[in-house]
Regions:
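General helical structural elements
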Residues: 11-16, 361
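N-terminal secretory signal peptides that target proteins for export/translocation
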Residues: 1-11
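Residue-level hotspots at or immediately adjacent to binding/recognition sites across diverse folds
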Residues: 29-365
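Bacterial N-terminal signal peptides
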Residues: 14-27
Length: 365
């Protein structure tokens, strides 16, 4: 009778345990580390390449060495667009000096341009996919008689943000508008603009002989919000913003006067709905910075200490070193992640078989 009762109850025990085991396994499955395919972006006939930005089509932009010209020992760096395994030089930029730091889905790029042979007078510029240059202008000239400006980001609407003569700006439909910092802040800089028109950046103010920097968020109408700092930190910078209004950047502990500032420690942060939280770093490297985020809340950046540097991903409350998420023995040391798109692709820079190169990481299915 005893054996018979046991046989009759076994199916019930199994039926109860299976859903329990399945439920318990879900958090573990959800925390499985992502994996990536890594692609070397190559160069334009030279040796080195530096990626700066990425759009949702998988286009990467930056600067790459061309073949050596004449008797000079150095290569010439040219703006490039990489897509689908092919890198091409952006035409129309040979007559001047240019660099790009952001690209939107239409292939419009922003950065700075100078026709000065000595590269002394850079101006904020928008570059079309075919290389057409449009200067965005700047605020009143400096004491040197010209205006210095640089565009830092462009959104899907073609709006650009940046800095001119230490003042943040928004460029939209051919007009340049100042993004003023809060009262008490003397200078500002905009680093990122979302597709909704919000901008993130920083403002600087004097506190005695020191300068304090705070992350800023500018709403669509121009209203500015000081995001503050985390407890124990003195400064912060808003480096990226997404369409949900989340801001990523870093906080720091800074000492010294305005003439000589030393930052002792950095930590990446994510700000959302009035709350800033530190994202931490990896165990062997204490300092971290966040450079970009997408609308899914995935954040990328890097950790660094002295000569050690590693590209990072923050996702679902965890931090990952990207070097651990690519195939082993790939020959790569991924040092910095600078952009992430809606597909989860990541671009940045590192060392590949001893050569400095840009990379593209594509999530494995």
């Amino acid at each position: 009778m005893l054996n018979g009762n046991l046989r009759g109850k076994r199916p019930r025990v199994v039926a109860f345990c299976l859903p329990l085991l399945y439920a318990l396994s879900q958090p573990l499955l959800a925390q499985t580390a992502p994996r990536y395919v890594v692609t070397d972006l190559g160069s334009l006939g030279g040796i080195e390449c530096a990626a700066t930005a990425l759009n949702d089509k998988g286009q990467v932009v930056g600067g790459a060495d061309t073949a050596k010209h004449g008797k000079g020992p150095e290569n010439i760096t040219n703006v490039f667009v990489w897509q689908g395994g092919r890198m091409r030089a952006v035409p129309g930029l040979d007559g001047g000096h240019a660099y790009v730091v952001s690209v939107n889905g239409a292939g419009q790029m922003v950065g700075a341009y100078s026709a000065d042979p000595l590269k002394a007078k850079f101006a904020a510029a928008l570059f079309g996919p075919t290389g057409k240059v449009k200067l965005l202008g700047g605020f009143p000239a400096t004491q040197h008689g010209y205006s210095l400006s640089q565009a830092q980001a462009i959104n899907a609407k073609g709006q650009a943000v940046g800095v001119s003569n230490n003042q943040a700006f928004l460029w939209s439909q051919g007009r340049l508008r100042k993004l003023a910092p809060p009262p008490g802040f003397q200078t500002s800089q905009a680093w990122s603009v979302s597709d909704t028109g919000q901008a993130a950046g920083k403002g600087d103010r004097s506190v005695g002989s020191a300068v304090r920097t705070h992350a800023m968020l500018w709403a669509v109408g121009g209203k500015v919000l000081d995001l503050g700092v985390l407890p124990g930190y003195t400064d912060s910078i808003g480096r990226a913003i997404n369409s949900k209004g989340q801001v990523a950047g870093w906080v720091g502990v800074t000492r010294g006067t305005s003439g000589r500032r030393i930052t002792l420690h950095y930590q990446a942060f994510l700000w959302q709905n009035g709350h800033m939280r530190g994202l931490g770093s990896i165990p062997r490297i204490p300092d971290s910075k966040a450079s970009a985020l997408n609308d899914k809340g995935q954040v990328v950046g890097n950790a660094y200490f002295k000569t050690d540097e590693a590209a990072l991903l923050w996702q679902n409350g965890r931090v990952y070193e990207l070097n651990a998420l690519v195939p082993p023995h790939s020959g790569w040391k991924l040092q910095n992640a600078l952009a992430i798109n809606s597909r989860g692709q990541i671009t940045g820079n590192g060392i590949h078989n001893g050569i400095r190169r840009g990379f593209l990481l594509t999530p494995r299915p």
